Amino acid sequence: MRKFDEMRVIFVEGESSMIGKAQIPTMTWKRMSEGKATILSIPMEHRVKWIRQNYEHFETTEVPRLLEKLQVLEKRVGNERVNQWRSLVAEKKWDQFVEEILVHHYDRAYDQASKRSRPNDFDEESGERKGADQGGADELFLENLEEQTYDKAAEDLMEKYDKVL
């Protein structure tokens, strides 16, 4: 990190001040939180497909482990919702299960973390995310998760942020 050029754009995923068990230095985290943000918006069907491909072991060899992890979520989302998820797992309705987890757990947790780390990106009264025109994060829509889509998005981001400096 000592070799970073402060005048160059650095792209980071801003989910947490922790990377595993290591903590990002406070000043670095503060600068990241104050920097310009771009939210990647991806259609749900592609998010579900990506998760199923990258975590397929939870559908095959590690179903018991998945069920254990769901148990931990009861405190956050309630017994009724976790029981619904268990039913989806038992019925092997994987697409529906993943979408439910994303909508009712992951996305909500991500928004809450974002509100803590980037409060200026949210409207104080409504709690809703501000648009770029209101001083909030920009949004970049990715129509799918193909390599060429990522490449184009990276080019667009580099061009956009090069203009900032």
Set out the residue ranges of the language-model regions.
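Conserved NTP phosphate-binding and transfer environment spanning the P-loop NTPase/kinase superfamily
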Residues: 30-165
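Conserved nucleotide-sensing/catalytic segment adjacent to the nucleotide-binding pocket
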Residues: 1-26
